[in-house]
Amino acid sequence: MKKTLVALSTMSALTSASEVYFIEPADGDKFMGDVKVVFGLSGFGVAPAGIKLPNTGHHHLLINADLPADMSLPIRADFNHRHFGLGQTETVLSLEPGTYKLQLLMGNYLHIPHDDPIYSEVITITVE
């Protein structure tokens, strides 16, 4: 029983200390054309969807979308909720001119946010 409690306690401490963030772009950046997005992660690992490993997950990029209201459900997959289930850590977005709000959210092997959700600050970019 003690081992189980220690394992749960360690997992909780790891997700609490974990951070997902944007390496690029920076908040307020302006672009002409495609936007390269590079994901950063500390205190946690990246693993493809479908692979259940402790202290890992994969990236989801929210575009002009709020965090899910129910974090116990899988993250939607659509234009505003991009899945990187192969374990990718960067992408290139082709966006129409406009202002975009971007946020990263980690999901587990089933695309469900972790019990202690790991998400980035929101950044805003403009495509001209």
Segment roles from a protein language model:
Residues 48-53, 110-119:
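Beta-sandwich strand segments
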Residues 35-39, 89, 98-106:
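Short, well-structured beta-strand segments within conserved domains
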Residues 3-13:
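Sec-dependent N-terminal signal peptides
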Residues 17-32:
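Short, compositionally biased P/S/T/A/G/V-rich stretches that sit at domain boundaries
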Residues 58-62:
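Beta-strand signatures of extracellular beta-sandwich domains
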Residues 96-111, 119-123:
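Internal, hydrophobic beta-strand segments that form the core of beta-sheet-rich folds
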Residues 72-91:
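A beta-strand/beta-hairpin structural motif
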Residues 40-50:
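Short amphipathic, basic-aromatic surface patches that mediate peripheral association
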